[in-house]
Each structure stands twice: as structure tokens, then as C-alpha cells.
Amino acid sequence: MTAILERRESESLWGRFCNWITSTENRLYIGWFGVLMIPTLLTATSVFIIAFIAAPPVDIDGIREPVSGSLLYGNNIISGAIIPTSAAIGLHFYPIWEAASVDEWLYNGGPYELIVLHFLLGVACYMGREWELSFRLGMRPWIAVAYSAPVAAATAVFLIYPIGQGSFSDGMPLGISGTFNFMIVFQAEHNILMHPFHMLGVAGVFGGSLFSAMHGSLVTSSLIRETTENESANEGYRFGQEEETYNIVAAHGYFGRLIFQYASFNNSRSLHFFLAAWPVVGIWFTALGISTMAFNLNGFNFNQSVVDSQGRVINTWADIINRANLGMEVMHERNAHNFPLDLAAIEAPSTNG
């Protein structure tokens, strides 16, 4: 009888836990995805802060030339970064217990792999948590779909690209200058500026910014006056009010006359779908572009594509970009190899008389 009572109490405790985890009445919704999200993001954040402050230099290129990234080793907020895991480790799973010592783990950049893998798992769970909360509230799932764009972008630069290149040392460093270095080297090796998917991503980000500014300014300019001239127009809105807060007909008429009639949305729902979809699709394409260039399906190459009637090359902007790429590649990992890969790929002339 005692055993039965204990089992019922155990089930009751588990049931209360399940109800608490999935309750939409909590100040912050946890959810089943949150059970995994909270420890992974806390781990990634904690290790990032500690490593950014105090991690010793990392042998990123695997040539016994450690690179310093932490504040205590001479960096500032701009130059500091979590240095990627060493090329000597490659794509191997490298937890602390796989190293002979903590010093070896730090020297080979173990914190980078720990942070990145926990971070990617955490943000994926955050996306799942968005869907879970939407489902429990009876909402549509598009918030999680929109968030999938930055999740895809982060996964591309932190996981897919290192897999394609064969080493976590090619992943994006976790810092400001490290991000810029990653971008410059990516351009040098993959000509990303000439990749159509990157162009779509640029159109998505800048177009999304433009459309957001246009929408916000149109709404703000066509608010329905509910206050006196001595009060802020914002005071005329009450949270949860049923009445429209701005005149969409006036905004539609203004924009239709500013450009042309059919450039303006007359349906608020389709307008807001467009505002969400444009940047999301653009960032999806960018993530897809990074993922294809990870396996060296690079941007367009129009080098020396214009010649005169005598066969002499007429330089274009493509040739200018190509020369810049070679210059950046020469400066990249200059102690790891003597020549950039593009130049070293040419077969050496024969020396046999």
C-alpha cells in the first residue's frame, strides 16, 4: 500500500511539472523546447564570457603559432574574439575529456566548439519554443518560420561552412574584428560578392529596412488624431482598443499617388506578410549561398572576359575584384602557406633540360 501511494505521489509530481512547463500563465513561457534551450544557452553564454576575458592564445592554423583573442592577453572589445578550434583538430568532436589536459584543450581552441555547438542547439530550441507557444495559444506558426532565417544563417557560418572546408578553424570567430576577417577571407576565397544568392540576401536586408521605414513612417503620418495639439499623439492609443489607430485608406492614397496606384497595398494582412517574407526569404538565400560556397561552389567569375579584336584583355570591374581577392588571400594565413591556393595550383615548369 505504501508503494502505491508513493507511485501516485511521484506521478502527481511529474504531472505538476509537466503542467508548469507547458503553462501559458507563466511570466516567461518555458515549454519542452525551453527545457533544452535554457541549459544550452546558459552554457554557451557563460563559456563565451569567461573565454572572451581570460582564454589563452589558440593555435588556430595548427602550425604552433597561437593567436591571442581574450582581453587579458592584450585585446580590447573590438579586437577580442573567441578564436576558432585549431586546424589540427579539424572536424573532430573535441570535448574537454578528449584532451590530455585542460591546457591542451584551451591551446587547441576547445571553447569555440563548445560555445558554437551549444549556441546552435540553443537557438534551434528557441525557434521550437516559439512554435510551441504559438501552438498552445492557438496562433499561426509564422513567428518561428521568420526566426528560421537567422538560425539558418548562424548554422551556415558556424557549422555548414566548417564542414564543407574540413575544419572548425574555418568557422567565423566570435568577435567583431574576427567577423570582419571572416568576411574578407570569404570574399577572397569564394568571391561571395558575385554570388547571386548573396545578392538576394543584400536585397532582402536592405529592402526589408527600406520597407520597414516606409511602413512605419506612413503609419505614423496617418494616425487618427485622438489627442490635443499639446499632447503626444502616442497618448491617443490604448492597448487592446478595437478601433483602428491609423487611416490605411489615407496611407494607401498617399503612397499610390507618390509612386503609382498598384505599388500600394490595400490589404493590411498581405502588407504585413510581405514585410515579414521579404527579408526572411533574402536571408534564407544568403544562408543557402554560404552553404553552397562551403563546398566551393563559388560566385561568378568574369575575369578577363572582355577582349579586343587582337585578343588583348580589357580590364573590367571583375578583374579589379579578382586582383583584390588575390591580395586578400596572400595576406591570409601568410605563415601557413607561401602562396595563395589560386597561385599555387599552377603546375611548376619542368627542369629536366
Curated annotation (Swiss-Prot):
A Pfam family assignment: Photo_RC
Keywords annotated in UniProt: Acetylation, Calcium, Chlorophyll, Chloroplast, Chromophore, Electron transport, Herbicide resistance, Iron, Magnesium, Manganese, Membrane, Metal-binding, Oxidoreductase, Phosphoprotein, Photosynthesis, Photosystem II, Plastid, Thylakoid, Transmembrane, Transmembrane helix, Transport
Binding-site residues, chlorophyll a PD1: 198
Residues where Fe cation binds: 215, 272
Gene Ontology CC entries for this record: chloroplast thylakoid membrane; photosystem II
Site positions (Cleavage): 344-345
PTM info: Tyr-161 forms a radical intermediate that is referred to as redox-active TyrZ, YZ or Y-Z. C-terminally processed by CTPA; processing is essential to allow assembly of the oxygen-evolving complex and thus photosynthetic growth.
Chain ranges passing through the membrane: 29-46, 118-133, 142-156, 197-218, 274-288
Modified residues (Phosphothreonine): 2
Chief location category: plastid
Site (Stabilizes free radical intermediate): 190
Family: Belongs to the reaction center PufL/M/PsbA/D family.
PANTHER family: PHOTOSYSTEM II D2 PROTEIN, PHOTOSYSTEM II PROTEIN D1
Misc. comment: 2 of the reaction center chlorophylls (ChlD1 and ChlD2) are entirely coordinated by water. Herbicides such as atrazine, BNT, diuron or ioxynil bind in the Q(B) binding site and block subsequent electron transfer.
Protein name in UniProt: Photosystem II protein D1
Organism of origin: Spinacia oleracea
Gene: psbA
